Regions:
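Anionic group-binding determinants
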Residues: 1-165
Length: 165
């Protein structure tokens, strides 16, 4: 039985104090670069988000490493906490070791309680909904789906990073 969740988390007081993350996909139609997934990283303080497209969920760890290097270089601050679900891509030994070595506190949400990671879940819902609307009205080809929806609707608060590997 699903438990109820009432506790409200305090919001971060500085950038990179807490990052929310989630993987979305697979999508039935791949992008022009064969990507069927994306991983989203949301800064709890500013709500700015970064989206990295990927062909396989197994790229989540390497994408996190690249994201971390990018934001820490830009901000000159360290990622302090990472909130994610208990998906296999986030609980691998490699991921645990990296976070431990870098001093990143892991906040793994309870199974079957996505509301505990509501920040990332809401961003995912907004992006996917925008893509569906644009596809419905034929605003762009199916293969451009999420990438174009993200660019059009969230360009002020989203940073897209698409790797052509």
């Amino acid at each position: 039985m699903k438990s109820t969740f009432h506790e409200k988390d305090s919001r971060a007081t500085t950038i990179l104090e807490r990052i929310h993350t989630d993987v979305c996909g697979p999508f039935s139609v791949a992008s022009t670069t064969k990507n069927r997934y994306y991983v989203i990283f949301v800064n709890d303080f500013s709500r700015k988000c970064w989206i990295l497209f990927m062909q396989k969920k197994s790229k989540t760890f390497s994408n996190f490493c690249e994201f971390k290097a990018l934001v820490e270089k830009e901000s000159r601050k360290q990622v302090k906490a990472l909130r994610s679900d208990n998906g296999g891509e986030f609980i691998s030994g490699e991921f645990k070791y990296f976070c431990s070595a870098e001093g990143i506190q892991r906040e793994l949400i309870a199974p079957h309680n996505p509301q505990q990671n509501g920040v990332a879940e809401r961003k995912n819902r907004m992006i996917v909904s925008a893509a569906r609307v644009m596809l419905h009205f034929r605003a762009f080809p199916y293969t451009c789906g999420l990438r174009h929806a993200t660019l059009r609707f969230m360009c002020k608060t989203v940073v897209l990073i698409e790797y052509f590997t």
